[in-house]
């Protein structure tokens, strides 16, 4: 993969991880 492809994949994954983390925080709170 090119660096741009890897970066695009990471940008797509990170928001999903952040949403999951926010959901976990809401459950814990």
Curated annotation (Swiss-Prot):
Keywords: Cytoplasm, Hydrolase. It is found in: Cytoplasm. It comes from the Bacteria. One of its GO terms (cellular component) is cytoplasm. One of its GO terms (molecular function) is hydrolase activity. Its EC number is 3.1.3.-. Optimum pH is 7-8. Transmembrane segments: none annotated. Homodimer. This is NADP phosphatase 1.
